[in-house]
Amino acid sequence: MQTYTYSSIPAQCFLGESPYWSVERQSFFWVDIENGKLFEHQLDSGKTTIKSFPHRLTLVLGGEGGELILALDRKIASFDLSTEKLAWLTEVESDLPLNRFNDGKCDAKGRLWIGTLSTKFTKGSGSLYRVGKDLKPEKQLDQLTISNGMAWTADNQTFYFIDTPTRQIKAYHFELETGEIEFNRVAVEISEELGFPDGMCIDQEGMLWVAHYGGSGVYRWNPTTGELIEKIELPVPHVTSCAFGGSNMDTLLITTAQENLSKDQLKEYPLSGDVFLVKTETRGEEANRFVY
């Protein structure tokens, strides 16, 4: 397997997540969920800025008008970076105060797919929603525990999805026009010693780059054969998500976490919670934006 080199961006996130590449701004965004922080790192200047919100901030991605789309607790909002104005768009599970949003992405039609979990991590308490132009969340999957990473194939015929505790990446038939999904097969089974699958992204070769929580790296899996192809080894235990970006879409931004680490472990792994940049030999695609 290839050996990768990395550079790190000091962030010290308790729970870093949701890396997103903004083409217009040529910068990476990510969040620190429990601390409600939104980070922006300009790739050329190396400058990092932080904005804080009085909510758990679980997701950042792009809207069709250049605004950001944020998930805060159980609500989705648009955020104008120039005015810093937040506009609420929709909400789910208002009757489940222990639940919050987790990971999310947009499909090629601009629909937002976003999952929930219980902050107590109660088994089966999470769901996966699809949100279209009418801003009405429609439940697609239920009985989830930690709704997490997702990706679509280039032909838009397969949707990959992770419910973290299952240690599986599932493949669903995907119908682009309607947004319907139907379970097809388990694409990847992840053994216990490799940790838990968390966030993921897909490259132009159709391979899945998966952050392994408790697995000290990002693992590249072949979802057709289920085989592990390679691994980006990182000096932290809890790797949470990854996304392609940069001018050539060949830079992987990787988020990590400090949660569930003791004081001694944090001394042993001081870069936990920081963000890592890794150049790869494969490229990703620009993330789809939310159309509403």
Indicate where each model-derived feature is located.
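Short loop/turn segments immediately following beta-strands, especially the blade-tip
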Residues: 172-180, 223, 280-285
